[in-house]
C-alpha cells in the first residue's frame, strides 16, 4: 500500500497527514489509491499519535491494544489505569519487549495536550 501512496505523490508522513487529516482528503486518496477511507483514518490517527516524544510504533501498537487509537483518546486516559491495562495486555500478547514506565505513560498523556489535533473523523 506504500507503493499506492507513492504513486499518488504521498511520500512523507507530513504530506500524508496534510491530506488524510480531512474526510475530503481521505476520499481523494481512496479514489487515487483504492485504500479504504477507514484504513486511511486509522493510519492518520496513528501518525498523529506518534508525534508524541518516545512513542514509536511498538508502543502505539500497545496503546491501540489498550483501546487508545488517537491523541484525543490518550488525553482522556488515567495514567495508572492505562499503564495497568497495557501491562495486562502485554503479558498475554507480548507486543513490546520493554514496558513503558508509569512515568513515561504519564508524560505521553501530558504531551498529548500539546499536540494540535488535525485528524477529523
Where are these regions (language model features)?
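C-terminal extensions
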Residues: 1-121
Amino acid at each position: 500500500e506504500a507503493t499506492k501512496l507513492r504513486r499518488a505523490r504521498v511520500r512523507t508522513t507530513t504530506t500524508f497527514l496534510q491530506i488524510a487529516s480531512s474526510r475530503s482528503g481521505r476520499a481523494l486518496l481512496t479514489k487515487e489509491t483504492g485504500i479504504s477511507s477507514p484504513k486511511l483514518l486509522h493510519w492518520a490517527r496513528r501518525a498523529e499519535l506518534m508525534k508524541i516524544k518516545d512513542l514509536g510504533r511498538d508502543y502505539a501498537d500497545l496503546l491501540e491494544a489498550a483501546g487508545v487509537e488517537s491523541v484525543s483518546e490518550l488525553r482522556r486516559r488515567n495514567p495508572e489505569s492505562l499503564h495497568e491495562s497495557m501491562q495486562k495486555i502485554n503479558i498475554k500478547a507480548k507486543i513490546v519487549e520493554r514496558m513503558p514506565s508509569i512515568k513515561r505513560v504519564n508524560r505521553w498523556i501530558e504531551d498529548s495536550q500539546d499536540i494540535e489535533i488535525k485528524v477529523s473523523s
